[in-house]
């Protein structure tokens, strides 16, 4: 077995185009934060839905990781409704990262 160092974004490693991979990475991070919020507070999906202003089935989709059903916009609204704060950090890519390939 041989290990290969991957990209900083697992979605790039899975073959997604860079822009789509970045969108997926951001959505996954937001979804993990919301799922963590629900688990840490030990609240029901119904309670989480009321807090976040969505339906219980939407919370079910969230905790089951149905990433394709959520936009960044929707997830940010849910995070904000939960009383959490979203910080955005934008940095320049290193020249090496742009040309880096996984063997």
Language-model-detected regions and their locations in the chain:
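N-terminal flexible/basic segments that precede or flank functional cores
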Residues: 1-32, 93-101
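Generic structural marker for isolated residues within well-ordered, non-membrane alpha-helices
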Residues: 34, 45, 75
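Short alpha-helical DNA-recognition segment
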Residues: 41-60
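DNA major-groove recognition helix of helix-turn-helix
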Residues: 63, 90
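Short, solvent-exposed alpha-helical "recognition" segments
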Residues: 66-71
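DNA major-groove recognition helix of helix-turn-helix/homeodomain DNA-binding modules
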Residues: 72-88
């Amino acid at each position: 077995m041989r290990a290969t160092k991957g990209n900083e974004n697992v979605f790039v490693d899975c073959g997604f185009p860079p822009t789509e991979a970045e969108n997926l990475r951001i959505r996954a991070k937001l979804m993990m934060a919301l799922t963590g919020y629900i688990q840490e507070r030990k609240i029901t999906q119904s309670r989480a839905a009321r807090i976040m202003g969505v339906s219980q089935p939407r919370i079910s989709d969230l905790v089951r990781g149905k990433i394709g059903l959520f936009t960044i916009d929707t997830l940010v609204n849910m995070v904000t409704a939960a009383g959490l704060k979203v910080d955005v950090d934008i940095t320049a890519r290193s020249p090496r990262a742009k040309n880096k390939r996984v063997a």
